[in-house]
């Protein structure tokens, strides 16, 4: 076992603080409409230009292991916020840095770290409750477009296209983002379906950036039973390999040698393949498989109707223009099914809804109807170069996550104003001792940081703006960093999803609180560098021969 190095007490806090400072300083320059870009070097290809906080955070590794631990913990804040809300990663990083910096000052002054953490937690609970009170529902297309615009770094064209996509396929509808072929963004609504089943093995992934399996113009095999014996599949796989097209297998389950063979074929490039479990259970699974069959122009291979897997031919398979399979769901885009058949199937489901007496059955049938009739909106991102395309695509995906979060939990005034407005709720927080009161004050000071950083990135004096916003009576009053004007943030279209602000605050307080209460850090001792001339030892032996000469 390798030797370890330990640090204790204030040494720990200082080391973590240095690491957090490096990471947060790199991330926070991107905050707000006038935030700057960060260029990330890649081991191959062109560098990536981004204004996305989590993308910057993920690239940072520090040489000093103690400092790196601090940086990695704040990286976790950004990643968790991105996973939970899809946006707000820079805000979360700024909040975490602020809580840690203020917290370390208090700990070094002799206060109890555990009580400080309890005070911070109480303040965050009160602030989140107040955030929910000032939140407004986000229902109309205009508000959705505004949220998308803000999240896409004030790019109105992105906000508008997301709002249009949501209007066409519904707020719960499936929206995917693809590379476009022109300079402008384009929206296309195609026949499609998404269901909540992901790939059966991570070895099917072929897009490492999105961690997804993407198949262009694939065959789709639908099987209403478990597949475990590979012999049943071999004749069909051989025919598909000859055609050169990829394959998506949807079955009750795929296990054992059948799954292993599909994985091996995929890795070797014999057949590009992905396998997923069929959605639903029992009779509902059979019905959903039939829906997919109608959508893709295929047949469900089922012994109930006299079709066996060994005898299946390419004519029994469905197909689609594109299929995207992630860890959690599968999206079939532009299936090759006959429009008349799809229409008849939709009518059949509508009749079933009318005749059903069970609310649960009606809800499930309604879901099937939405999947079959709703279609999939595809946003095609246009750009002049590949570097711009990557950056723009990331912004569209961020904006899409933010608008979904806004629809889910509503919106609050943006630009860091919401966190300023909830500060008054901290006045009534009950504390047990002076150290907890200081914890509440740490959270209070930290919540003003995002507004100050947004203003700082515009080059204006942050203290003046923060004071003016804080002392104004109107909840929505704030500073528009893009234009330099004061006014009603909601009317100016500067909105943040409540979920994004809430998640950023909770995650930042959670990790920063843990860091403040850390008393010891343990890491591996750095390996000693070997001497530059390993042959030197042998040369030393030659001197001994000289001694022997003296004996003669």
UniProtKB/Swiss-Prot annotation:
A single GO molecular function term of this UniProt record: ATP binding
Family stated for the protein in its record: Belongs to the chaperonin (HSP60) family.
Protein's cellular compartments: Cytoplasm
Binding residues annotated for ATP, in chain numbering: 30-33, 51, 87-91, 415, 480-482, 496
Protein role: Together with its co-chaperonin GroES, plays an essential role in assisting protein folding. The GroEL-GroES system forms a nano-cage that allows encapsulation of the non-native substrate proteins and provides a physical environment optimized to promote and accelerate protein folding.
Official protein name in the record: Chaperonin GroEL
Originating gene: groEL
Subunit structure: Forms a cylinder of 14 subunits composed of two heptameric rings stacked back-to-back. Interacts with the co-chaperonin GroES.
Enzyme class: isomerase
PANTHER family: 60 KDA HEAT SHOCK PROTEIN, MITOCHONDRIAL
Keywords: ATP-binding, Chaperone, Cytoplasm, Isomerase, Nucleotide-binding
Species of origin: Coxiella burnetii (strain RSA 331 / Henzerling II)
UniProt-listed Enzyme Commission number(s): 5.6.1.7
Gene3D superfamilies cross-referenced by the UniProt entry: GroEL, GroEL-like equatorial domain, TCP-1-like chaperonin intermediate domain
């Amino acid at each position: 076992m390798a030797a370890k190095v330990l640090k204790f007490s204030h040494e720990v806090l200082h080391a973590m603080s240095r690491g957090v400072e490096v990471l947060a300083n790199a991330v926070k320059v991107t905050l707000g409409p006038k935030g700057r870009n960060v260029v990330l070097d890649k081991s191959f290809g062109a560098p990536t230009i981004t204004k996305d906080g989590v993308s910057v955070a993920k690239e940072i590794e520090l040489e000093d292991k103690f400092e790196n631990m601090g940086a990695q913990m704040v990286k976790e804040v950004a990643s968790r916020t991105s996973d939970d809300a899809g946006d707000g990663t820079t805000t979360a990083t700024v909040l975490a840095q602020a809580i840690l910096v203020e917290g370390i000052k208090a700990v070094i002054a002799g206060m109890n770290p555990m009580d400080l953490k309890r005070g911070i937690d109480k303040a965050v609970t009160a602030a989140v409750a107040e955030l929910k009170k000032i939140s407004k529902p986000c229902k109309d297309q205009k508000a959705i477009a505004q949220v998308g615009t803000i999240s896409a770094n004030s790019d109105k064209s992105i906000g508008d296209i997301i709002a249009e996509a949501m209007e066409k396929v519904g707020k719960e509808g499936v929206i995917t983002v693809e590379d476009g072929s022109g300079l402008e963004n384009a929206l296309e609504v195609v026949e499609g379906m998404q269901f909540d089943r992901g790939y059966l093995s991570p070895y099917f992934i072929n897009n490492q950036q999105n961690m997804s399996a993407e198949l262009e113009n694939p065959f789709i095999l639908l099987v209403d039973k478990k597949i475990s014996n590979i012999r049943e599949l071999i004749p069909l796989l051989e025919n598909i390999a000859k055609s050169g097209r990829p394959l998506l297998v949807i079955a009750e389950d795929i296990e054992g040698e059948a799954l292993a063979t599909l994985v091996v074929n995929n890795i070797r490039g014999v057949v590009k393949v992905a396998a997923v479990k069929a959605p639903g259970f029992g009779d509902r699974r059979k019905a959903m498989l039939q829906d997919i069959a109608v959508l893709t122009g295929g047949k469900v291979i089922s012994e109930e109707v006299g079709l066996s897997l060994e005898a299946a031919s390419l004519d029994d398979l469905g197909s689609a223009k594109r299929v995207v399979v992630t860890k959690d769901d599968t999206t079939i885009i532009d299936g090759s099914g006959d429009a008349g058949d799809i229409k008849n199937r939709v009518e059949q489901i509508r009749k079933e809804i009318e005749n059903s007496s069970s609310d649960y059955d009606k809800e499930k049938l309604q879901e099937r109807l939405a999947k079959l009739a709703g279609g999939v909106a595809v946003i095609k991102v246009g750009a002049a170069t590949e570097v711009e395309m990557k950056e723009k695509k990331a912004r569209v995906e961020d904006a899409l996550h933010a608008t979904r979060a806004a629809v889910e939990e509503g919106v609050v005034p943006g630009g860091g104003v919401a966190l300023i407005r909830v500060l008054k709720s901290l006045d009534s927080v009950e504390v047990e001792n002076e150290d907890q009161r200081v914890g509440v004050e740490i959270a209070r000071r930290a919540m003003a940081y995002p507004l100050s950083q947004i203003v700082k990135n515009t080059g204006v004096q942050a203290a003046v703006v923060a004071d003016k916003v804080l002392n104004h009576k109107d909840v929505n009053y704030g500073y528009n960093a893009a234009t330099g004007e004061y006014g009603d943030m909601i009317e100016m279209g500067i909105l943040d999803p409540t979920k994004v602000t809430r998640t950023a605050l909770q995650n930042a307080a959670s990790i920063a609180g843990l860091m403040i209460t850390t008393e010891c850090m343990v890491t591996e001792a750095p390996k000693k560098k070997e001497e530059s001339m390993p042959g030197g030892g042998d040369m030393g032996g030659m001197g001994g021969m000289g001694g022997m000469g003296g004996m003669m």
